[in-house]
Amino acid sequence: MVESIPNALLVSIHQNTYTVSRRYHGAQVFYEDEVSSRQLAEHAQEILRQSLDPANTRQAAKLPGTVYLMEHITCPAILVECGFLSNPEEDALLRTAAYQTKLAAALASALLSHVPMAEE
């Protein structure tokens, strides 16, 4: 369906977990191996870092070939891991309306500033 829309983007939103250690935290953006997806992911990663956690050193990264949707989409696509549910502090933060709003605003800002606006 998304591919039938001109100039479409796909943003898949997730929460991360890592059961081996609870210390991992921070948003991270992944992309399929396509230049436009990589550029969007890098831009979104930087906006999330600036807006949510300037100390976050995570970089946008290529997805391993294990996410069906991302392997079969032809438009630019990113997968956003908003934080780690396995980290108690981040889990608590992710559950608050204020942080969810801040996260949504950062993602919207990243998308709107990356995509050229249609001429009126």
Locate predicted features.
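Active-site-proximal helix/loop segments of hydrolytic enzymes
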Residues: 1-120
